[in-house]
């Protein structure tokens, strides 16, 4: 259900601000988005998996907090990130 390490490394390489960056808000949001999408696919098949549903809600809340932080600190980075991830319409 969780994303593979290879996919996570690809996401980190794409959104990292510098070499070895795994903790910036952009990287964390991108990894959480991939996790959220993966859990959504799982829940489409397993509708009654309430433990995964709770995990999904926790990840969505964490991503929401990180997005609010990024929007508050650097609006341009926030806009670029949501455009590249396709989060807002």
From Swiss-Prot:
- Keywords, A to Z? Ribonucleoprotein, Ribosomal protein, RNA-binding, rRNA-binding
Gene Ontology cellular-component terms listed = cytosolic small ribosomal subunit
Which top-rank group of organisms is this from? Bacteria
Q: Which SUPFAM superfamilies match?
A: S15/NS1 RNA-binding domain (SSF47060)
InterPro entries for this protein: Ribosomal_uS15, Ribosomal_uS15_bac-type, uS15_NS1_RNA-bd_sf
Q: Where is the signal peptide?
A: none
Please verify whether the record's keywords include Transport: no
Ribonucleoprotein as a keyword of this entry, yes or no, is yes
What Gene3D superfamilies has UniProt attached to this entry? 6.10.250.3130, S15/NS1, RNA-binding
Q: Which GO terms describe its molecular function?
A: rRNA binding; structural constituent of ribosome
Could you tell me the Gene Ontology terms of the biological process aspect for this record? translation
Q: What does this protein do?
A: One of the primary rRNA binding proteins, it binds directly to 16S rRNA where it helps nucleate assembly of the platform of the 30S subunit by binding and bridging several RNA helices of the 16S rRNA.
Its subunit composition reads:
Part of the 30S ribosomal subunit. Forms a bridge to the 50S subunit in the 70S ribosome, contacting the 23S rRNA.
The entry assigns this protein to a family as follows: Belongs to the universal ribosomal protein uS15 family.
Q: What is this protein called?
A: Small ribosomal subunit protein uS15
